[in-house]
């Protein structure tokens, strides 16, 4: 949650895949109820379960759709999982709203502050900025390559009215921005005492947990977890696909990921 990459530069992974109770899970009605079951499987002793439940009750409150997700059937055997009803219309709102809530909870408990430092040419930046903007213990610095994003994403990142948000336009490419961020995580010399440096891209496992929840939710709504589904996932990186794979390792019936 608070470290991003492991000390050896690798990614954090669970020691084991927690298994779900299909008979219990298939009867849950709402996305929040699914999240209340899935998320505590990963928090272990780091957080009290009642604190996690309270946190989840207050996360994703700014989504347009009442149950956060809408599933539209377009053919007898084909449905569309609409993940764009969050505040920035990106599927990343699910993982980043959850991550920001856990960041804030941890920082408040430890009486510390944090800097979110990231690079983006798309929806990660706007989703991260929106997720963190109201938490005074988190300052967000997001590097954006000049001229390399859509107009709506530029506006999402540069018009947020919050003293905690600092979008920075860089005269360079996305790779240039990413290099600056990587060097920052290596040095960390600019950090104050009792201050974390946080990653918000898909290396942060909490983002994956948030996305695991909507794969289980969709499988419950479509066939009550009774038979394997195929998921076709438009994605720019492997994070969203990996969340689907992780759900299958936990017990969600899965045929293919396309």
Residue ranges of model-derived segments:
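PLP-dependent amino-acid enzyme catalytic core
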Residues: 1-258
